[in-house]
């Protein structure tokens, strides 16, 4: 798979090891004919050793085939997250550092999660496109605020903060895009 096609969460082979991509920085230097470079922050699977590497857009990194198991978030065990396989009820435990910032989207009983498994070991989670979270704290709407589309900060039930439209109030359930971390609409 070419470096410019790789997304966060992909698992690739690099230097004889298997790594999961956690962060991507794209840079296009002006002086070198505009060759786009990608800097990947990746962690070894299993083990979680951090590696930082840069690639040209057309560099090839072989993608590793993983087993994806549809699961439901079950509970938190200390700092670890436990997911239950929807088919055979196998529990998959992932440490908080593997979950990373995605922890802000995970609520009790969240469904539609895929746990990525290599050699019977869970290595990552793939969240649904949107999740429903509750607004626990946001400033009140200003009078006449409907004429403008100013966003305001809102704290969600998972502790995460996002910007929401002015008409959203405390206690409302909102959809949040798990890729961008942005407000995606009201939940029913």
Swiss-Prot record:
Q: Which GO terms describe its cellular component?
A: cytoplasm
**InterPro entries listed in its UniProt record:** Elong-fact-P_C, NA-bd_OB-fold, Rib_uL2_dom2, Transl_elong_fac_P/YeiP, Transl_elong_KOW-like, Transl_elong_p-like_YeiP, Transl_elong_P/YeiP_cen, Transl_elong_P/YeiP_CS
Alphabetical GO biological process terms: peptide biosynthetic process
Q: Which domain of life is it from?
A: Bacteria
Q: Can you tell me where the transmembrane regions are? A: none
Among the GO molecular function terms of this UniProt record, one is:
translation elongation factor activity
Please name one Pfam family that this protein belongs to.
Elong-fact-P_C
Similarity-based family? Belongs to the elongation factor P family.
| Name of this protein | Elongation factor P-like protein
């Amino acid at each position: 798979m070419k470096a410019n096609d790789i997304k966060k969460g992909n698992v690739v082979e690099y230097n004889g090891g298997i790594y999961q991509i956690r962060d991507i920085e794209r840079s296009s230097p002006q002086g070198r004919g505009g060759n786009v470079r990608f800097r990947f922050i990746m962690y070894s699977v299993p083990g979680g050793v951090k590696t930082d590497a840069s690639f040209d857009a057309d560099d090839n990194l072989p993608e590793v085939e993983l087993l994806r198991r549809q699961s439901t978030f079950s509970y938190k065990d200390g700092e670890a997250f436990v997911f239950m396989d929807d088919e055979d009820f196998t529990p998959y435990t992932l440490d908080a550092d593997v979950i990373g910032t995605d922890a802000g989207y995970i609520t009790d009983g969240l469904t539609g999660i895929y746990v990525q498994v290599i050699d019977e070991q869970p290595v990552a989670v793939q969240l649904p496109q949107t999740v429903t979270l509750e607004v626990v704290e946001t400033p009140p709407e200003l009078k006449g605020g409907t004429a403008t589309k100013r966003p305001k900060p809102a704290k969600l039930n998972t502790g995460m903060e996002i910007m929401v439209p002015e008409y959203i109030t405390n206690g409302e359930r909102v959809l949040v895009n798990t890729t961008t971390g942005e407000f995606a609409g009201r939940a029913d």
